[in-house]
Amino acid sequence: FRMKVSCRNFLEYDCAADLEKLDFGAMEGGVKHIGGGSNLLFTADFPGTILHSAIRFIEQKDGSLVSVGAGVVFDELCEWAAERGLWGPENLSHIPGEVGAAAVQNIGAYGVEAKDIIRTVHCFDTRSRRFTDFEVADCRYGYRESIFKSEEYRDRYIVTAVDFVFRRDGAPVLGY
């Protein structure tokens, strides 16, 4: 839409440890963390700081367990998994956005939701200034919902990485 809007500061980080260096309480005008911006439209200037994750890694840890940086484009993860014969995210291919946002929004399509393949969401707690992990059961996933969208958690936790569990069975989900 080419909106002529701006923010006070735009900070992109490529390492989760960089978040520990920020003084969130001292940032004038507030702080907003964004993903790729595919579901976002600023219609006025933002007086504060915008943060964006450039944490981009995909690491196969143990067979079907894959750890992914929050800044990875979700469709790139789908392609990566397909190239390795890993099943689970294929129905979510071409959904715009990044891995961190996928965990926050519980993206879904064709009978599959992010919660079905997420094991752990790794976060930075801006209040305690510590890293913490949320197992999938703790994320309170629902239809396009999660604990990270709640009033209490929305601006408190920043997703830094997500662990997924994929399958090797070669069986697509076709029950939609």
Per-range role (PLM):
Residues 2-3, 40, 131-176:
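Phosphate/pyrophosphate- and phosphate-bearing ligand-binding catalytic cores of soluble enzymes
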Residues 1-121, 125-127:
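Anion-binding (especially nucleotide phosphate/pyrophosphate-binding) glycine-rich loop
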